[in-house]
């Protein structure tokens, strides 16, 4: 199973780096040749992605980290189902005019929220040179496959309308 393979690979890499306790942030890509790590760091998950931890356990990420740091016991109430988050990728370069399809994306079964953080006039720059994600999509479903499918479907409903960025050179 994919989750077991990820857990095994993550355990090996974290151990090789000397990580023994505390939070670990991992970003990886599943490819035809296996698991490719993008980032592995001794830190918590960043930004709003940490909301998934509270969805899954009923306890905030900050509470878990602090309790672990001072060796205080805490109770996690594992919630049924699977939760997912998509950091919405920057679709193209340009100046944002509007985002269409937000209501349709929110209506996809399993979607908890669609949060767009950028506003009209924001300069969009795709990765790898790009800046922050334009927003996040959160899902909750019976299993991980359904949670991922809901995220992907909601993402297809979004359309970022942009204008070209016109650079002015003053001589």
Task: Identify the function of each model-found stretch.
Residues 34-36:
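Conserved protein kinase catalytic/activation segment
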Residues 4-26, 32, 41-100:
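Active-site "cap" helix and flanking loop/linker of ATP-utilizing ligase/carboxylase catalytic domains
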Residues 1-8, 12, 145, 152-157:
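Active-site nucleotide/adenylate-binding loops and adjacent lid/helix of ATP-dependent enzymes
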Residues 66-171:
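Peripheral (often C-terminal) accessory segments that flank ATP-dependent C-N-forming ligase machineries
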Residues 40-43, 117-119:
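Generic beta-structure capping elements
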């Amino acid at each position: 199973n994919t989750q077991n393979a990820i857990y095994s690979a993550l355990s090996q890499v974290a151990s090789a780096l000397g990580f023994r306790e505390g939070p670990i942030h991992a970003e990886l890509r599943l490819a035809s040749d296996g698991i490719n790590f993008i980032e592995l760091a001794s830190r918590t998950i960043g930004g709003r992605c940490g909301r998934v931890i509270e969805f899954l356990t009923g306890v905030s990420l900050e509470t878990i980290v602090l309790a672990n740091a001072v060796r205080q016991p805490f109770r996690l109430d594992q919630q049924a189902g699977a939760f997912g988050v998509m950091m919405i990728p920057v679709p193209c370069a340009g100046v944002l005019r509007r985002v269409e399809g937000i209501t349709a994306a929110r209506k996809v079964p399993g979607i908890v929220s669609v949060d767009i953080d950028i506003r009209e006039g924001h300069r969009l720059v795709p990765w790898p040179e790009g800046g922050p994600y334009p927003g996040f999509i959160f899902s909750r479903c019976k299993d991980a496959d359904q949670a991922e499918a809901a995220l992907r479907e909601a993402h297809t409903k979004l359309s970022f309308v942009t204008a070209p960025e016109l650079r002015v050179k003053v001589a």
